[in-house]
Amino acid sequence: MKKYMPFIHGAVAVAASLAVQVAGAAQLVIAQVAPLSGLEAIQGRAYSAGLQLAFNNANKAGGAGGHTFSLVRKDDGGRPDDTIAATTQVLAESKPIALAGYFGNRSIAELVKSGILEKEKIALVGYRTTEIRPDVPYVYSVRAGLRDEITKIAEHLATVGITRLGLFHEDGPGAAALTAAVDEITKKTGSTITARATYPAGTARVSPAIDIFLKTPPQAIIMLATGSAAAGFIEQYRLGGGAAQLFAQSGADIEQLAQRLGEETMQGIAIAQVTPSPYKISGRLAKEFADTVAKTPNLEVPPSYAMMEGYIAGKTIIEAARRMGAKASREAFVAALDTVETDMGGYRVGFKPGMRSGSRFVELSIVTGAGKIRQ
Protein backbone atom coordinates (compact mmCIF):
# COMPACT_ATOMS: atom_id res chain seq x y z
CA MET A 1 0.00 0.00 0.00
CA LYS A 2 1.27 3.46 -0.87
CA LYS A 3 2.22 5.49 2.20
CA TYR A 4 1.20 9.13 2.45
CA MET A 5 3.78 11.19 4.32
CA PRO A 6 4.73 14.86 4.33
CA PHE A 7 6.96 15.82 1.42
CA ILE A 8 9.66 18.42 1.85
CA HIS A 9 9.70 21.56 -0.24
CA GLY A 10 13.41 22.13 -0.61
CA ALA A 11 15.47 24.92 -2.01
CA VAL A 12 14.03 27.57 0.30
CA ALA A 13 17.41 29.28 0.44
CA VAL A 14 17.53 29.41 -3.34
CA ALA A 15 13.91 30.58 -3.35
CA ALA A 16 14.84 33.72 -1.47
CA SER A 17 17.34 34.65 -4.15
CA LEU A 18 14.72 35.36 -6.81
CA ALA A 19 14.20 39.10 -7.04
CA VAL A 20 11.13 40.63 -8.65
CA GLN A 21 13.28 41.21 -11.74
CA VAL A 22 15.76 38.57 -12.86
CA ALA A 23 18.00 38.95 -15.88
CA GLY A 24 18.07 35.40 -17.16
CA ALA A 25 16.66 31.99 -16.41
CA ALA A 26 16.13 31.22 -12.74
CA GLN A 27 14.45 28.99 -10.26
CA LEU A 28 10.94 30.40 -10.00
CA VAL A 29 9.36 30.36 -6.57
CA ILE A 30 5.61 29.77 -6.31
CA ALA A 31 4.06 30.50 -2.91
CA GLN A 32 0.92 28.93 -1.50
CA VAL A 33 -0.85 30.23 1.61
CA ALA A 34 -3.64 27.82 2.45
CA PRO A 35 -5.31 25.83 5.24
CA LEU A 36 -2.71 23.15 5.93
CA SER A 37 -4.36 22.66 9.33
CA GLY A 38 -7.94 23.12 10.48
CA LEU A 39 -11.30 22.29 8.87
CA GLU A 40 -10.12 22.36 5.24
CA ALA A 41 -6.59 21.02 5.73
CA ILE A 42 -7.12 17.91 3.61
CA GLN A 43 -8.02 19.99 0.57
CA GLY A 44 -5.27 22.53 1.18
CA ARG A 45 -2.63 19.83 1.41
CA ALA A 46 -4.02 17.96 -1.60
CA TYR A 47 -3.91 21.10 -3.73
CA SER A 48 -0.33 21.66 -2.58
CA ALA A 49 0.60 18.10 -3.52
CA GLY A 50 -0.87 18.59 -6.99
CA LEU A 51 1.19 21.74 -7.53
CA GLN A 52 4.32 19.92 -6.40
CA LEU A 53 3.67 16.98 -8.74
CA ALA A 54 3.44 19.32 -11.73
CA PHE A 55 6.60 21.19 -10.73
CA ASN A 56 8.50 17.95 -10.16
CA ASN A 57 7.61 16.79 -13.68
CA ALA A 58 8.74 20.08 -15.18
CA ASN A 59 11.99 20.13 -13.22
CA LYS A 60 12.84 16.56 -14.24
CA ALA A 61 12.27 17.54 -17.88
CA GLY A 62 14.69 20.46 -17.60
CA GLY A 63 12.20 23.16 -16.65
CA ALA A 64 10.21 25.54 -18.84
CA GLY A 65 11.70 28.50 -20.67
CA GLY A 66 14.93 27.60 -18.92
CA HIS A 67 13.31 27.95 -15.50
CA THR A 68 12.82 25.38 -12.76
CA PHE A 69 10.18 25.62 -10.04
CA SER A 70 10.14 25.59 -6.24
CA LEU A 71 7.01 25.55 -4.08
CA VAL A 72 6.99 27.37 -0.74
CA ARG A 73 3.86 27.11 1.39
CA LYS A 74 2.52 28.60 4.59
CA ASP A 75 -0.42 27.57 6.75
CA ASP A 76 -3.20 30.09 7.38
CA GLY A 77 -5.49 27.58 9.13
CA GLY A 78 -8.39 28.99 7.11
CA ARG A 79 -8.17 32.31 8.99
CA PRO A 80 -8.29 35.44 6.76
CA ASP A 81 -6.07 37.51 9.06
CA ASP A 82 -3.44 34.80 8.92
CA THR A 83 -3.79 34.64 5.12
CA ILE A 84 -2.76 38.28 4.83
CA ALA A 85 0.03 37.99 7.42
CA ALA A 86 1.46 34.83 5.86
CA THR A 87 1.26 36.29 2.35
CA THR A 88 3.11 39.41 3.45
CA GLN A 89 5.74 37.25 5.12
CA VAL A 90 6.29 34.91 2.18
CA LEU A 91 6.51 37.81 -0.26
CA ALA A 92 9.28 39.37 1.84
CA GLU A 93 11.16 36.15 2.57
CA SER A 94 10.88 34.09 -0.60
CA LYS A 95 10.26 36.65 -3.39
CA PRO A 96 7.82 34.40 -5.31
CA ILE A 97 7.00 35.13 -8.92
CA ALA A 98 3.40 33.96 -8.38
CA LEU A 99 0.95 32.83 -5.70
CA ALA A 100 -1.22 29.72 -6.05
CA GLY A 101 -3.73 27.49 -4.30
CA TYR A 102 -5.50 29.88 -1.92
CA PHE A 103 -8.73 28.84 -0.17
CA GLY A 104 -11.81 30.45 1.34
CA ASN A 105 -14.28 33.20 0.55
CA ARG A 106 -13.10 35.60 3.24
CA SER A 107 -9.40 34.86 2.78
CA ILE A 108 -9.47 35.64 -0.93
CA ALA A 109 -11.77 38.64 -0.47
CA GLU A 110 -9.38 40.07 2.13
CA LEU A 111 -6.38 39.38 -0.10
CA VAL A 112 -7.97 41.32 -2.96
CA LYS A 113 -9.14 44.10 -0.64
CA SER A 114 -5.68 44.48 0.89
CA GLY A 115 -4.19 45.67 -2.40
CA ILE A 116 -1.20 43.34 -1.99
CA LEU A 117 -1.58 41.85 -5.45
CA GLU A 118 -1.59 45.23 -7.20
CA LYS A 119 1.21 46.62 -5.04
CA GLU A 120 3.44 43.59 -5.63
CA LYS A 121 2.28 43.08 -9.24
CA ILE A 122 1.89 39.39 -8.49
CA ALA A 123 -0.68 36.94 -9.85
CA LEU A 124 -2.72 34.44 -7.86
CA VAL A 125 -3.12 31.37 -10.08
CA GLY A 126 -5.73 28.93 -8.80
CA TYR A 127 -8.02 29.31 -5.81
CA ARG A 128 -11.13 27.76 -4.23
CA THR A 129 -14.18 29.63 -2.98
CA THR A 130 -17.90 28.98 -2.51
CA GLU A 131 -19.01 32.34 -3.86
CA ILE A 132 -19.29 34.03 -7.24
CA ARG A 133 -16.28 36.31 -7.61
CA PRO A 134 -16.02 39.26 -9.99
CA ASP A 135 -13.13 39.29 -12.45
CA VAL A 136 -10.36 41.36 -10.87
CA PRO A 137 -6.75 42.02 -11.92
CA TYR A 138 -4.08 39.50 -10.90
CA VAL A 139 -6.60 36.80 -9.83
CA TYR A 140 -6.72 33.83 -12.22
CA SER A 141 -8.97 30.79 -11.91
CA VAL A 142 -7.99 27.51 -13.58
CA ARG A 143 -11.44 26.01 -12.98
CA ALA A 144 -15.01 26.70 -14.02
CA GLY A 145 -16.77 29.39 -12.03
CA LEU A 146 -19.42 28.71 -9.42
CA ARG A 147 -22.06 30.06 -11.81
CA ASP A 148 -21.13 27.27 -14.24
CA GLU A 149 -21.49 24.67 -11.49
CA ILE A 150 -24.88 25.97 -10.37
CA THR A 151 -26.08 26.01 -13.97
CA LYS A 152 -25.01 22.39 -14.46
CA ILE A 153 -26.88 21.30 -11.33
CA ALA A 154 -30.03 23.32 -12.12
CA GLU A 155 -30.19 22.08 -15.71
CA HIS A 156 -29.81 18.48 -14.57
CA LEU A 157 -32.60 18.87 -12.01
CA ALA A 158 -34.88 20.45 -14.60
CA THR A 159 -34.39 17.52 -16.97
CA VAL A 160 -35.66 15.09 -14.32
CA GLY A 161 -38.61 17.27 -13.33
CA ILE A 162 -37.33 18.55 -10.00
CA THR A 163 -38.33 22.21 -9.68
CA ARG A 164 -38.80 22.94 -5.93
CA LEU A 165 -35.29 23.59 -4.67
CA GLY A 166 -33.57 24.51 -1.43
CA LEU A 167 -30.42 26.61 -1.20
CA PHE A 168 -27.82 26.14 1.55
CA HIS A 169 -24.80 28.45 1.54
CA GLU A 170 -22.26 30.35 3.62
CA ASP A 171 -23.39 33.67 5.03
CA GLY A 172 -20.53 35.88 3.93
CA PRO A 173 -19.83 39.10 2.02
CA GLY A 174 -20.65 37.46 -1.31
CA ALA A 175 -23.97 35.95 -0.20
CA ALA A 176 -26.17 38.54 -1.92
CA ALA A 177 -24.47 38.09 -5.29
CA LEU A 178 -24.61 34.32 -4.86
CA THR A 179 -28.34 34.16 -4.12
CA ALA A 180 -29.10 36.57 -6.96
CA ALA A 181 -27.20 34.34 -9.38
CA VAL A 182 -28.96 31.21 -8.13
CA ASP A 183 -32.36 32.89 -8.53
CA GLU A 184 -31.47 33.97 -12.06
CA ILE A 185 -30.23 30.52 -13.07
CA THR A 186 -33.11 28.56 -11.54
CA LYS A 187 -35.66 30.91 -13.10
CA LYS A 188 -34.21 30.14 -16.53
CA THR A 189 -34.63 26.41 -15.90
CA GLY A 190 -38.19 26.76 -14.61
CA SER A 191 -37.28 26.02 -10.99
CA THR A 192 -37.96 27.93 -7.78
CA ILE A 193 -36.01 28.26 -4.54
CA THR A 194 -38.65 27.42 -1.95
CA ALA A 195 -36.38 27.30 1.12
CA ARG A 196 -33.12 29.08 1.96
CA ALA A 197 -30.70 28.64 4.84
CA THR A 198 -27.16 29.70 5.68
CA TYR A 199 -24.33 28.84 8.05
CA PRO A 200 -21.86 31.31 9.63
CA ALA A 201 -18.80 32.03 7.51
CA GLY A 202 -15.70 30.06 8.43
CA THR A 203 -17.61 27.49 10.51
CA ALA A 204 -19.44 24.19 10.15
CA ARG A 205 -22.43 25.18 12.33
CA VAL A 206 -25.34 23.85 10.30
CA SER A 207 -28.08 22.87 12.79
CA PRO A 208 -30.30 25.98 12.31
CA ALA A 209 -30.20 25.47 8.54
CA ILE A 210 -31.33 21.87 8.86
CA ASP A 211 -34.38 22.91 10.87
CA ILE A 212 -35.45 25.22 8.05
CA PHE A 213 -35.29 22.50 5.39
CA LEU A 214 -37.07 19.96 7.58
CA LYS A 215 -39.93 22.42 8.16
CA THR A 216 -40.18 23.43 4.49
CA PRO A 217 -39.06 20.36 2.53
CA PRO A 218 -37.83 21.00 -1.03
CA GLN A 219 -37.38 18.25 -3.62
CA ALA A 220 -33.63 18.88 -3.82
CA ILE A 221 -31.12 21.05 -1.96
CA ILE A 222 -28.19 22.81 -3.61
CA MET A 223 -25.30 23.02 -1.14
CA LEU A 224 -22.79 25.79 -1.84
CA ALA A 225 -20.59 25.01 1.14
CA THR A 226 -17.13 23.98 2.24
CA GLY A 227 -16.33 20.31 2.72
CA SER A 228 -16.67 20.39 6.50
CA ALA A 229 -19.96 22.31 6.42
CA ALA A 230 -21.39 20.08 3.67
CA ALA A 231 -20.42 16.92 5.57
CA GLY A 232 -22.05 18.17 8.76
CA PHE A 233 -25.16 19.20 6.87
CA ILE A 234 -25.58 15.88 5.05
CA GLU A 235 -25.03 13.87 8.22
CA GLN A 236 -27.43 15.85 10.40
CA TYR A 237 -30.04 16.33 7.66
CA ARG A 238 -30.27 12.60 6.99
CA LEU A 239 -30.35 11.79 10.72
CA GLY A 240 -33.22 14.26 11.05
CA GLY A 241 -35.20 12.41 8.40
CA GLY A 242 -34.53 14.79 5.50
CA ALA A 243 -35.27 13.08 2.19
CA ALA A 244 -34.47 15.72 -0.44
CA GLN A 245 -31.88 14.94 -3.09
CA LEU A 246 -28.60 16.68 -2.23
CA PHE A 247 -26.36 18.43 -4.75
CA ALA A 248 -23.07 20.10 -3.84
CA GLN A 249 -20.59 22.33 -5.61
CA SER A 250 -17.06 21.07 -6.15
CA GLY A 251 -15.56 22.67 -3.04
CA ALA A 252 -17.53 20.25 -0.88
CA ASP A 253 -14.80 17.69 -1.63
CA ILE A 254 -16.26 14.27 -2.35
CA GLU A 255 -13.30 12.51 -0.72
CA GLN A 256 -13.76 14.37 2.56
CA LEU A 257 -17.46 13.52 2.53
CA ALA A 258 -16.80 9.85 1.83
CA GLN A 259 -14.21 9.69 4.62
CA ARG A 260 -16.57 11.16 7.20
CA LEU A 261 -19.92 9.72 6.12
CA GLY A 262 -20.98 6.11 5.67
CA GLU A 263 -22.03 4.58 2.35
CA GLU A 264 -25.71 4.68 3.26
CA THR A 265 -25.56 8.39 4.10
CA MET A 266 -23.57 9.20 0.95
CA GLN A 267 -25.82 7.26 -1.42
CA GLY A 268 -27.30 9.49 -4.10
CA ILE A 269 -25.24 12.57 -3.20
CA ALA A 270 -24.29 14.45 -6.38
CA ILE A 271 -21.33 16.80 -6.63
CA ALA A 272 -20.37 19.12 -9.46
CA GLN A 273 -16.74 18.49 -10.43
CA VAL A 274 -14.60 21.04 -12.24
CA THR A 275 -11.72 18.76 -13.21
CA PRO A 276 -11.51 15.34 -14.85
CA SER A 277 -11.74 12.46 -12.39
CA PRO A 278 -8.45 11.52 -10.72
CA TYR A 279 -9.76 7.96 -10.46
CA LYS A 280 -10.20 7.01 -14.11
CA ILE A 281 -8.31 7.51 -17.36
CA SER A 282 -10.58 9.79 -19.38
CA GLY A 283 -7.96 11.64 -21.42
CA ARG A 284 -4.31 12.59 -21.69
CA LEU A 285 -4.37 14.80 -18.58
CA ALA A 286 -5.93 12.09 -16.41
CA LYS A 287 -3.40 9.52 -17.63
CA GLU A 288 -0.48 11.88 -17.04
CA PHE A 289 -1.75 12.60 -13.53
CA ALA A 290 -2.26 8.90 -12.74
CA ASP A 291 1.20 7.99 -14.06
CA THR A 292 2.79 10.79 -12.03
CA VAL A 293 1.03 9.71 -8.84
CA ALA A 294 2.06 6.09 -9.42
CA LYS A 295 5.71 7.10 -9.74
CA THR A 296 5.73 9.41 -6.71
CA PRO A 297 6.57 7.85 -3.32
CA ASN A 298 5.49 9.32 -0.01
CA LEU A 299 2.66 11.55 -1.19
CA GLU A 300 1.40 13.75 1.62
CA VAL A 301 -2.25 12.84 1.03
CA PRO A 302 -4.12 10.38 -1.22
CA PRO A 303 -5.02 11.42 -4.80
CA SER A 304 -8.20 13.48 -5.02
CA TYR A 305 -10.07 16.05 -7.09
CA ALA A 306 -8.33 18.82 -5.12
CA MET A 307 -4.96 17.30 -5.99
CA MET A 308 -5.94 17.14 -9.66
CA GLU A 309 -6.93 20.82 -9.49
CA GLY A 310 -3.57 21.71 -7.96
CA TYR A 311 -1.87 19.73 -10.72
CA ILE A 312 -3.77 21.75 -13.34
CA ALA A 313 -2.81 25.01 -11.63
CA GLY A 314 0.82 23.89 -11.62
CA LYS A 315 0.75 23.04 -15.32
CA THR A 316 -0.84 26.43 -16.05
CA ILE A 317 1.98 28.19 -14.17
CA ILE A 318 4.54 26.14 -16.09
CA GLU A 319 2.94 27.07 -19.41
CA ALA A 320 2.99 30.77 -18.48
CA ALA A 321 6.66 30.48 -17.51
CA ARG A 322 7.43 28.86 -20.86
CA ARG A 323 5.74 31.75 -22.67
CA MET A 324 7.47 34.32 -20.47
CA GLY A 325 10.91 33.36 -21.72
CA ALA A 326 14.27 33.62 -19.99
CA LYS A 327 13.86 37.08 -18.43
CA ALA A 328 11.70 36.44 -15.40
CA SER A 329 9.67 39.11 -13.66
CA ARG A 330 6.24 39.27 -12.10
CA GLU A 331 5.08 41.70 -14.77
CA ALA A 332 6.31 39.42 -17.55
CA PHE A 333 4.67 36.43 -15.90
CA VAL A 334 1.29 38.20 -15.73
CA ALA A 335 1.61 39.25 -19.37
CA ALA A 336 2.38 35.64 -20.30
CA LEU A 337 -0.61 34.37 -18.30
CA ASP A 338 -2.88 36.59 -20.38
CA THR A 339 -1.78 34.70 -23.50
CA VAL A 340 -2.17 31.16 -22.15
CA GLU A 341 -4.36 28.93 -24.30
CA THR A 342 -3.57 25.29 -23.68
CA ASP A 343 -5.24 21.91 -24.14
CA MET A 344 -3.95 19.58 -21.44
CA GLY A 345 -5.75 16.61 -22.96
CA GLY A 346 -9.40 16.55 -21.94
CA TYR A 347 -9.12 19.90 -20.16
CA ARG A 348 -8.55 23.34 -21.66
CA VAL A 349 -7.31 26.46 -19.88
CA GLY A 350 -7.31 29.85 -21.56
CA PHE A 351 -6.92 33.47 -20.47
CA LYS A 352 -6.79 36.83 -22.17
CA PRO A 353 -6.73 40.41 -20.86
CA GLY A 354 -9.93 41.00 -18.90
CA MET A 355 -10.87 37.29 -18.89
CA ARG A 356 -9.24 35.46 -16.00
CA SER A 357 -11.62 32.51 -15.58
CA GLY A 358 -9.79 29.85 -17.52
CA SER A 359 -12.19 26.91 -17.83
CA ARG A 360 -15.86 25.99 -18.27
CA PHE A 361 -15.45 22.26 -17.56
CA VAL A 362 -18.17 20.86 -15.24
CA GLU A 363 -19.51 17.34 -14.82
CA LEU A 364 -21.62 15.70 -12.11
CA SER A 365 -20.35 12.89 -9.90
CA ILE A 366 -22.92 10.74 -8.14
CA VAL A 367 -22.20 8.37 -5.25
CA THR A 368 -23.81 4.97 -5.82
CA GLY A 369 -25.19 2.58 -3.24
CA ALA A 370 -21.86 0.76 -3.17
CA GLY A 371 -20.06 3.98 -2.29
CA LYS A 372 -18.56 4.25 -5.77
CA ILE A 373 -18.27 7.51 -7.70
CA ARG A 374 -19.72 7.64 -11.20
CA GLN A 375 -19.98 10.47 -13.69
Predicted regions: what is each one?
Residues 17-22:
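N-terminal signal peptide c-region/cleavage motif recognized by signal peptidases
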Residues 29, 42-47, 61-133, 231:
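Beta-alpha junction/loop-to-helix N-cap segments that form part of ligand/metal-binding clefts
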Residues 31-52, 74-80, 103, 168-176, ...:
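Extracytoplasmic "Venus flytrap"
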Residues 40-65, 181-187:
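Short, polar/charged alpha-helical segment
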Residues 85, 137-241, 280-287, 291:
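Extracellular/periplasmic Venus flytrap/periplasmic-binding protein
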Residues 96-194, 245-263, 267:
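Extracytoplasmic ligand/sensor domains, especially the bilobed periplasmic-binding protein
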Residues 234-308, 367, 371-374:
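Extracellular/periplasmic periplasmic-binding protein-like sensory domains
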Residues 293-311, 318-374:
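Segments of small-molecule ligand-sensing domains
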